[in-house]
Amino acid sequence: MVSIRPDEISSILKQQITDYDQSVSVSNVGTVLQIGDGIARIYGLDQVMAGELLEFEDGTEGIALNLEDDNVGAVLMGEALGVQEGSNVKSTGKIASVPVGEAMQGRVVNPLGQPIDGKGEIPTSDTRLIEEMAPGIIKRRSVHEPMQTGITSIDAMIPVGRGQRELIIGDRQTGKSAIAIDTIINQKGQDVVCVYVAIGQKSASVANIVEVLRERGALDYTVVVSAGASEPAALQYLAPYTGAAIAEHFMYQGKATLVIYDDLTKQAQAYRQMSLLLKRPPGREAYPGDVFYLHSRLLERAAKLSDAMGGGSMTALPIIETQAGDVSAYIPTNVISITDGQIFLSADLFNSGLRPAINVGISVSRVGGAAQTKAIKKIAGTLKLELAQFDELAAFSQFASDLDEATQQQLERGKRLRELLKQPQFSPLNLAEQVAVVYAGVKGLIDEVPVEDVTKFATELREYLKLNKAEFIEEILKEKKLNDGLEATLKEVINEVKSSMLATV
């Protein structure tokens, strides 16, 4: 027979009383009423907040967007094949956040910050809210540093500054993404962190862009955020905010960052799809009433911070796709009014062989002029006007039989300027090369060169400077000014290259 020892029992009871944990966990739980098309209607969740993360039974996450009297409308961030009517949903008390930090560079992630490049987990513990308030007035300063794109026509006529929002707008297949990729490639060695956000694009296109960046050594300082065409609308809607959050981390550390949103038309369409399925009232072009706020709160996060805040910057290059060149549609006009200027790409110019196909007449940079380097500002001041006048004269001259000599001369120079500004893809030019090319055209030093040989002349001029005048390039890149001595050297080089070229023609 087992003997009972009272002292042993009392010590066990005392121990259990001591170890007793009285904490109570309260969770806000609801039930799925209806599920379909990436939208869930949930009963319960009385304490849920707008924009709060929800967790479904199968681990799928969602965001509460519609808070109604008797149900909550949520969008699902995943396939949600395991979510059924009657399954439980739990509110997390958190807002969506993404991992950020140095380890993100060189990686391809989805809008939740999860790696999709097959290189394993990203070793970072830092996170940042996807939706953050834009910096206030006191935290900012005016744009004053150049963000060189490496594309002569942009840096000379439509300059972009660090902290600016410059829209790239045009029809499909006019080279919008090409300009953005060239700008990323041109940041090599400039200590700029780049974020490329691909929204609703084909996976093959994104893979091609990643490969181009890798080949040119640009992936090392770039983060690619991809929400493909096959992803749920909620992820396409979130992708730009994820890109902004990743860039903000570096901006608040005092670094310069560049974010490409390719493209915001697809994000607006994803948001329209979500809103209509949530039964929000449609407005113009069936977009919801707050579609302006969708883009304004995103693009306002781009800024040049004050010195007290570390002096970092986020430059945004949003891309918008137009239909048949119609910039007066709803989304294009919204984004044009939010940004600090636009680069308009024309399908007609593209098809005529002018690449990049920039329509100088309606492209503008509202704040970039203050950031333009003195060297290019000094010589490119009249370039935009000359090209705009050339376009007008070219249209007029089709109907005029005899033109006066001054008009003919202007037309001939315009043709040569057009040829000088042609630039192949993935070949950005440095400041010194741009200065040399623009100077030759604007000063009329190549008026005798046949139009068909202008591109060849520009290539030979750049090669000559690299081989024989390396000190000229170094001086321009260092001082960013074109003084009288450098100007005399440049004029001498241009005439020398021109003479040797005309002798062989």
From Swiss-Prot:
What keyword terms does UniProt attach to this protein? ATP synthesis, ATP-binding, CF(1), Hydrogen ion transport, Ion transport, Membrane, Nucleotide-binding, Thylakoid, Translocase, Transport
| UniProt GO molecular function | ADP binding; ATP binding; proton-transporting ATP synthase activity, rotational mechanism
One GO cellular component from the entry?
Answer: proton-transporting ATP synthase complex
Q: Which Pfam families match?
A: ATP-synt_ab, ATP-synt_ab_C, ATP-synt_ab_N
- The answer, when asked if Transport is one of the entry's keywords, is yes
Against CDD domains, the record matches this protein to: ATP-synt_F1_alpha_C (cd18113), ATP-synt_F1_alpha_N (cd18116), F1-ATPase_alpha_CD (cd01132)
Q: Give the E.C. number(s).
A: 7.1.2.2
- Where does this protein hold ATP? 170-177
* Catalysis: reaction(s): ATP + H2O + 4 H(+)(in) = ADP + phosphate + 5 H(+)(out)
| The organism's place on the tree of life at top rank | Bacteria
Q: What does this protein do?
A: Produces ATP from ADP in the presence of a proton gradient across the membrane. The alpha chain is a regulatory subunit.
Assembly behavior: F-type ATPases have 2 components, CF(1) - the catalytic core - and CF(0) - the membrane proton channel. CF(1) has five subunits: alpha(3), beta(3), gamma(1), delta(1), epsilon(1). CF(0) has four main subunits: a(1), b(1), b'(1) and c(9-12).
* Family to which this protein belongs: Belongs to the ATPase alpha/beta chains family.
Name of the protein described by the UniProt record: ATP synthase subunit alpha
Q: What is the lineage of its organism?
A: Bacteria, Bacillati, Cyanobacteriota, Cyanophyceae, Synechococcales
